[in-house]
Each structure stands twice: as C-alpha cells, then as structure tokens.
C-alpha cells in the first residue's frame, strides 16, 4: 500500500507516520478514568495535656475500593518515638477512631504531627497538628459536694475543670450500692459543666460523678442522700411519739462534723417559736412544687418557708387573728406582762406573749394544717379557735374556724363549776400539748398557765372535715370535787409533748398534779397515765397512777411533766404492747398498754420502774430497742431493751459527756433504717423568761446513737459563731428531714423576735 522512499546518500526512509498513528489509536478501546483515593482526619487540630491527656482521632478514606484503611504515624521536630506520644492502634479502618495519648512531658517545640496514610495508595495521606500543653494538672471539682434530696426531685449540679483542654467540660453519671444505669437517677438540662440530677424512686445514698472529657482519668464525685420520708407531720414525728426518722440518708455519722455540717440559713419570724416545725415534701404552691417547713409563732402567725432555699424563701405567711382567719376587731396575742395577769398569774412563764403554743398537725391527704390560736381583745375577752389551714395558700379551708369556749362543758362539781357543769375556760386553759389527728378526728388537749386555778385537763375531739366537736368526745381529767380540796387541776401539758396513739386508735397521755379518786370509783385522774378509747367519743379504757400520788400532788411533783411513748410491739416478748413515760420525780414507768396497772397504795403495778435520778420534762425516743432521754441537770442517756425479759437495763448503756440543765431535752433521732443513727438534742437552758437562769443561744447537739459518749457535732464548735442559733425556747424539739435539721428559736429578743435555724450538710 505504501512505498518506502529512500535516499541513496543517507539511507533514510520516509514513512507516513500520521496515517499510521491514526490507525493505531483507532484500534485501542477507551477505558473510564478511576476515582482518586483521598484521606482526611478529624479533628483537624487539637490540644492535649502532657502527662495523661488523650484525644480521639478519626481518619476517613474516600474511594478505597479494597477498604484497607490507614496507617498512623507520629513525628515531631522536637521528639521521636514515644516522646511524641502513643497511639491506641497504628492502623484503623476508615471511620474507626483511635486514641492519642500525650507524652509525659511536652517536647520542644510542643507540636506533634499525626499522619494517616492510605494503605491502598501510600501517596495519599493527611496530617493534623497536635499542640502538647504543659503538664499542669487538670482537675475537676463538683458542687454541691454533699446534700439531701427527696425521691424524684431534681438537684442542680455544676462542675469546674481547672486547666481544661479546649473547654471540653465533663460528662455526668450516677451510681449507687444497689443500682446501675438509669435506676441510679437521670440527668436533664445538661451542659458541658452543669446538669439537673433527677433522683430515682428508691431511697438511698447515690453518687454523682463529673468526668473530664479532655482527660477521662480525672473526675469528681459527690454524695447525695435521697429520702422517701413522707413528712414530719406531727409532734415527735409520728403518733407513737417515738421521735424517729428512719428515712434519713444524707445525714450519717461520717458526714455530721464541723467540717461538713453546719448552719445553712435562717428564716425570721414575728414571734417566738414554741411549736415543733413540721415538714412536708413536694407541696405545690402557686404551681411550683416545694419541700415546705411550717412554723407557728406566739404572735399568732403561720409561716410556710421553702425548706431548702438559701437565702430564706417565704412562700406565704398569715395571721390567725385577722378577719380572714376569724379574728375580730382589736384582737391581739395575749401579753404575758402588764396589768391584769392575762396569762396565768402574770409570772411570765411564756414570754412575751401567748398565741400559738401547741405543735400543729398536718393531714397530707388534704394538705391541711390544724392549729389552735389563743387571743384577747381590749375588753379582755379571750378566744381560742381551731383552724384548718390550706397549706397551699394559708387560707382557712373551713371558715369560720371553730371557737373553743364555755359552750363546751361536762357535768361536774370541780373547781370553777357552775350549776353542776364544768365549762371550758379559754382564758385559763393553756393549749400546750401537740395536736393529734387520728381516724378523721383532731384531738386537742389543755392544761394551765402557771398553775393558775381554776383549771382542768381537757381532751376534746373535733371532726377534721367540719371542725365541729365530735359527739361525746370531751374528756375532763378532774371534773368533780374531791373531799374538801378547793382545786381540781390535772392538766395535760407533758413538756409540750402530744398524746400518743396505738394501732387501735387509743389515746395515751399523762396528767399533772391534781385530784385523784379513780381507784374508788371516781372520775378524777390527777398524776395518771390515762388510756382513752375513741370508738364512740372519748371514754376511759384504763389508767395507771403511782402509789405516791398524794405526795406528787401535794408537792407539785407532776407525773405529767413528761409525755408517754408507745414502744414498738414485742410479739415474742413477755409483754407485747408497751408504753413508757415519766415525770418530775424522775421515775420512768414501763407499762403494759393492755393492762396499765391502775392504782395500788402498796405497789406500782408496772412492768418496770427506772429511776432516772432527775426530773423528766421530755418525750423519750425509742429506736432499735434503745431508749433515749435527758433529765434535768443530767446527761442524755441510752437504755438498752432486752427483748427476752421485756425490760430495760437498769443502768444506762451509754450517756453523753454533756449535761442538760432545766428543762432537760426531748431528743429526736435520724437513721438510715437500722444504720447511721444520730441522736439530736437541744440544750435550752438559757430560755430567756423570768424563770430562766439566763438568756442565750440554744445549742444543738448530735451524738452517735450507738454510743452517746461520741458527740459528732454541736452548734457551738465552729469558729466565729458560724453555727450559733437564736435564743432558746423552753421544751422545743429539733425536726430532722431530708438532710437538714430545723430549730425554732426566739431570735435575739429585740430586733428579731423569732427565728428558724436551718442546719445541714455544707455544700462545699
């Protein structure tokens, strides 16, 4: 086809290459171009702390058809090998993280290059620059470090990370001895340094941990006690009056000391706080749930405070003598001083005024507070009223309140009787005992002011739904004259205690000095333990009177200066149903509730008598077969109960180093079931009225319940008066709930007339 053309001189042949080339190209098939491999690494830059800091990296390889991933290498101008750091793996699949750990010391220069190289195509790679920060320790702190919380409630927790790398913050977790995962609680509203911890539904001790994102080996934890306590709704915690809160998980024998426990805040009131503060959880007020502490004052006021808020948050407060609460024009609290001796004989036993004295009681099903007020007008007309207060608003739930006056009377010839009737006297009768709520009836008891005659002991039942007096539910302890005695007495005051209630609804209380003839068929029960049946009104079911009753009466040695406690049933013991109480003579009588013993002039028909050696103005605590009580001028004492013999040891099992002056102490006890029990007691010696030896701060004490010689803390220990309380009030009782202890005081008796002190675990 083609001819070769050659030159003879150069032997050169010319070939038409263009045509040949076109022919070759036309004969080669076309192949599609391959996609190129690419590598990227994230994050693109990082700072990692030397000496333990870590950072995850991920290489992404695109178009790697054989899925061979990458190989990782480290290099640096100022380092080599492990001095540049270490890797958790030297190769990885695309998208699989590896962890870089910084070297112990930062190189110089403090930059390391981390390179990911494609295995399929080693020409394809990507690098990131890692800055190694100095080995200044990263540390995590958490706030609060300790605290208390009710089940299902939330607590704001915050973390601070010192020398945090890249402001990475923390992650949150919760743990506990008997839980895992979500059953230990959950977290909401989470940020890099804060969260709301939501407690689980089970009570216990939980730990919240904040873990550094930049260095997972660094973390901080706290301890939160979560309680399922339904409330402190009545005097001494429950109707048995045993004074125990066994649902306390925040306050332990390890956590209560002057380094971690102290005064958190105070709430001022308009008058002295004689009644025990009451605590109720998860109460909705104005659409917001609160744990609430309720306080009553002698200035006729009720306060509802947020039980946890610092500084103090008053949710509402009301006066029980304004028109909205049944008061009339010109009514005031009853002045203790001045002309006319409006309170007793005018000696100022309760000073400077009388308004609300007895501890109220709460019905949690209706959120109702039952409380009795006492007032007077300018005409010296005296008023006592039973109020049913809506705890969500402070308003009267049942209006008007129930007047308690001379329209209530019993047949009798006793002191102050007229025409064969003894009428209730709102002037002379002192509503000192705590109120009782049992089976839909509110029971209220009275004694005297300063033994000012004529007076009697009264117990009256009111329908909780209507406040109307219950038919036949009126008891007078001394309705009839005995011999030629001009007085009756027999007041029910019990050092501010409250009648106890057993599982059958029977009421138990102790009367003070007064006339007695029940042993001869009479109806007078001075200086006696009385058991009232409540099935049909009120009726005496049984009683016990000491053999020396006549001497007790003649010498004002009240049996009823202290109150009774119903003990836990002893089904396998010699006596299944027991009661204990004592008075000014210093004898604690252990009684059979099914057969109290009545009266014998030759012997006391009791299970056991323990001579404390000191007058008793207290309600004993009973916990895990141990009794706790403090007489006047004596230490707090622990007596161990022997379940086999059904009796207490005659000598104290342990006692405190501290002695309590007049009036002794009614303790309270907190525990986590059968462990971490703490006995709390107030030294109210300097209670500021004319009969007191002085005026000064009440002192709160905390003891290990297994050995009272071990004092854990008291409010006078910390420097600079950090934990000092307001002035003492005679007979007051501490309330323990949800990691806090609430104490009513009289403020400083000048610029502050009343104050609630709130103690608890110091948050930091």
Predicted regions located by residue number:
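A short beta-strand micro-motif common to beta-rich folds, especially ectodomain repeats
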Residues: 108-120, 203-213
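Short, solvent-exposed loop/linker segments at the N-terminal edge
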Residues: 46-53, 147-153
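C-terminal edge beta-strand
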Residues: 126-132, 220-226
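Short, well-ordered beta-strand segments
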Residues: 65-80, 128, 166-180, 220
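Proline-enriched interdomain boundary motifs that mark the N-terminal boundary
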Residues: 35-43, 136-144
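Mobile, glycine-rich extracellular loop/lid and propeptide segments
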Residues: 227-570, 576-598, 617-639, 665-670, ...
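Low-complexity "stalk/linker" and mucin-like segments enriched in Ser/Thr/Pro/Ala/Gly
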Residues: 75-101, 105-106, 174-194
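Short, exposed coil/turn segments at beta-strand boundaries within extracellular/luminal domains
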Residues: 119-126, 213-220
